[in-house]
Amino acid sequence: MTAMEKNGAGRKICVITGGSSGIGFATAMRMGKKGDAVVLAARTPSKLEQAIAALKAEDIEAFACPCDISNWASVKALARYAQSLGEVTAVMHIAGMSPHMGDAEKIMRGNALGTVHIHDAFYPVIADGGCLIDTSSMSAYLAPSRIM
């Protein structure tokens, strides 16, 4: 490994929130096979470890960063970590909460405030020409049965 590789110079980084499973993990696999190094962010360290192992088994350069997107300090730490690894060229914000995952306040903190945190933390560090993509689920269109 050269000195440039050790400090991340020239390495393209794709950050994926919710990357330990589902759409996030599939996105990590796709971006990694394209040649980007991927940083997976999720709340559960054990799930992150499993996802990283699966990616590395496919010869994908992958890193884990436990992160609670509803917590500003946690998201800021994620942005710093990703930037320390190389040039952040893509952020795929896929993490989110479904209605069955908690009360309304918890869901709003994760989905709405979490999205604001991701934007605020990554806009200053993303490379020129980079992209930040937010993904949402169909639950945004489904009214809870108690409201109707």
Report each predicted region and the residues it spans.
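A glycine-rich helix->loop->beta "capping" turn
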Residues: 9, 60-61, 81-93, 101, ...
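Rossmann-fold scaffold of SDR-type NAD(P)-dependent oxidoreductases
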Residues: 17, 88-96, 134
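Conserved glycine-rich cofactor-binding loop
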Residues: 20-21
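N-terminal Rossmann-fold NAD(P) dinucleotide-binding loop
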Residues: 24-25
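Conserved glycine-rich Rossmann-like NAD(P)H-binding loop of the short-chain dehydrogenase/reductase
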Residues: 34-50
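The beta1-alpha1 cofactor-binding region of Rossmann-like NAD(H)/NADP(H)-dependent oxidoreductases
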Residues: 66-77, 112-115
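Active-site Tyr-X3-Lys motif and surrounding loop/helix of classical short-chain dehydrogenase/reductase
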Residues: 80, 102-109
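Catalytic loop of short-chain dehydrogenase/reductase
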Residues: 97-105, 128-148
